Amino acid sequence: MYGFFKTMALAVVAAATVGCATVKRSAAPAGEKRCAWEKGRRERPVTTDAVLCYGGSHHRTPFLWDGKRLAPYVTYTDEEGREQWLFDGFIFLEFVDASRPDGRTYAFETGNRNAPAAGKEQWQELIAYFFAEGNCIDALDKSVAEAERRIGRAPTRRRVVVMLPDPVIHRMYADTTATTVYWGELDGRKLDFSRNEDRIAACKWYIDSVRERFAAGGYEHVELAGFYWIREIVTRPQDTEYSYHLTRSDIMLPHIAEYLHGLNCSLDWIPYYGSRGYDAWRSFGFDQVYLQPNYYWKPQNDMDDVFRRIGELGVGLELEFEPTLLAGRKGSEAFRERFRAYMRHAKETGVYGSRPIAYYHGTNGFYDLWASPDAEDRELFHELCRFIVGNPLRGERAE
């Protein structure tokens, strides 16, 4: 499998642009490079209920997001046998590639002190994974097509958001003596990530490569809505000198956001409660932002304050769970109660129906809940799906 995606990655370099203006590796304004679907947008697309789909790292089981795995995320069949559209957004993301056949590990974000940062080759492999036939985006497009044959046309194309790797300054994140010239070449020149313009150039190259592959796919049932910033903190000069020196988010992200906005694409982000920069998200250029309460793992977190901050900041909510809530797992009753607290607080505070929601479920938690034959798990699954399909925000956004 690794060899397949490595071979596929080579195609990223020479990917032909279909439906887009020729994407040159230059400083041309983003508006001059818009694809047909980007030109036709009146506004940047948003989602009401987006599910996080972690994939790309060899340590994950299952490894692929094929049609069989994606089907329960596309539609929901209720207790009366009625099939309905479920998630309208799919965020494909990864933060590390571990357990690789070559024995190496690469990090796609700052903060990893144990693995070297991914370079251009690993970024290409990640793109190849997302766009492989029968996987991720291609599988989603086909799954939606199959569902439309059963229940009719979806209200909107399912919206895809693809992660944007973090151009880590030093090859080893926390080692300031490690090289900053490790990523690879663009236009015949080795990039140096000590230079902000080179980090931005790498991100633009990745964005354009994803857009090219998406255009070449000819997808009819999904659209590329935007990109997801993988690091859960952003920094400003007032942060500690150490962390700011290693990230410099404030001088890079606004340029990336401006580029994406010129393409009518969004820049999305999911910081955790209390993380650096989460209260200044607009200054970095983010569009759709969700706050992680982390209550599922840290019940000491004050949910009343979390939802107060959501209201004050004008952001959405990330609803969080893992397979640890499945019946028979140690401590599952406590995890179920915490999970239900998210939905309860969302309704009581008015977040439900007014703010977008993202759904974290680990690697395969939602699928495991769907597949469980246990009566308690089935009850919880239906409760969650009713929460999603009944989201009042869908009607307001023509969903």
Report residues per predicted region.
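Bacterial N-terminal signal peptides that target proteins for export
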Residues: M1-A9
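Structural preference for beta-strand elements that scaffold enzyme active sites
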Residues: T47-L52, L86-F92, R157-V161, E223-Y228, ...
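Substrate-binding cleft of secreted/luminal carbohydrate-active enzymes
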Residues: Y272-R276, Q288-E399
